[in-house]
């Protein structure tokens, strides 16, 4: 008798995606992050659902409702900090996942890569709107500063900002709609994840060598299921340690002050996972130029497949490209640090140098190095 998992209409979809899926035998732990992101998304949707049961999206009560969750709801503090720090884990996994794709040339699967970029934008939008909901000082001023950037769009900018705000400033209407979108977007993200996987399973996974692995495949279960479970345990241990020992480590103390439109915090900055883009935004003294650079800092990922000029897919056997890749990582760390610093000397010039280097490495140095490596390898 044929196994039910191979005949049942629903089970055979799950079977072909997670059980009998042929996977390359050489996948390293860098391939764990896709499944870790799935776990992060699940944790965020679950904790978010329970938080939404107690949260009120009204400017008068939003801050107090979060306080109520932490003080009066059973394990409300745990839900709140799991959700807040879960977002940080989500972005750590996201950036490592994208970094792995860049290093091993996974971007040559263009459909999967482009859906991944859409996913990145959707998750960033979700996180930004979620940060506004506690209605602390940094929530309010972060929302004001970031939404106000849209006013740099010629002709329609000012009207667009007022349309998003639902008035002439960030207020009750803004908070209500941000809550609505923050609730909705994770489900759109889930749908995009399914499309992402659909395209991935059309081509099969890449592997560290970048060489086609068709002759050497193994079933996903039990080999990679057990490997993924180890990843889950490590990540959930790290998240638990963060939540239970220092839940406010990655947050901003200003967000424990209720939002006050009459009092601007000395340093307005987003959560740590947006600081690199914020530093690029601030490094250009022109408003529209800064906004374009901000968008391009993420959208530049879309041109990476076009700029792949190497005859080899992966960087595994390309030491010069490896050096540039790790230089890019160092530049991103520098930008993250600069994004959290005040706009003064020497931070301004460091930020501008790092921003120029970021675009220079991706657009010029990496393609040029690829051509040089082709020449050195007589290709």
UniProtKB/Swiss-Prot annotation:
Membrane topology: Multi-pass membrane protein
Co-factor remark: Binds 2 heme b groups non-covalently.
Location relative to the cell: Mitochondrion inner membrane
Positions that bind heme b b566: 97, 196
GO process annotations (BP): mitochondrial electron transport, ubiquinol to cytochrome c
PROSITE patterns reported in the protein's UniProt record: CYTB_CTER, CYTB_NTER
Gene Ontology MF: a single term: ubiquinol-cytochrome-c reductase activity
TM ranges: 33-53, 77-98, 113-133, 178-198, 226-246, 288-308, 320-340, 347-367
Residues given in the record as a ubiquinone binding sites: 201
Bridged cysteine pairs (disulfide): none
Required cofactor names: heme b
Amino acids binding heme b b562: 83, 182
Main localization, broad class: mitochondrion
GO cellular component: mitochondrial inner membrane; respiratory chain complex III
This protein's UniProt keywords: Electron transport, Heme, Iron, Membrane, Metal-binding, Mitochondrion, Mitochondrion inner membrane, Respiratory chain, Transmembrane, Transmembrane helix, Transport, Ubiquinone
Function comment: Component of the ubiquinol-cytochrome c reductase complex (complex III or cytochrome b-c1 complex) that is part of the mitochondrial respiratory chain. The b-c1 complex mediates electron transfer from ubiquinol to cytochrome c. Contributes to the generation of a proton gradient across the mitochondrial membrane that is then used for ATP synthesis.
Note: Heme 1 (or BL or b562) is low-potential and absorbs at about 562 nm, and heme 2 (or BH or b566) is high-potential and absorbs at about 566 nm.
SUBUNIT field: The cytochrome bc1 complex contains 11 subunits: 3 respiratory subunits (MT-CYB, CYC1 and UQCRFS1), 2 core proteins (UQCRC1 and UQCRC2) and 6 low-molecular weight proteins (UQCRH/QCR6, UQCRB/QCR7, UQCRQ/QCR8, UQCR10/QCR9, UQCR11/QCR10 and a cleavage product of UQCRFS1). This cytochrome bc1 complex then forms a dimer.
Similarity comment: Belongs to the cytochrome b family.
Name under which the protein is recorded: Cytochrome b
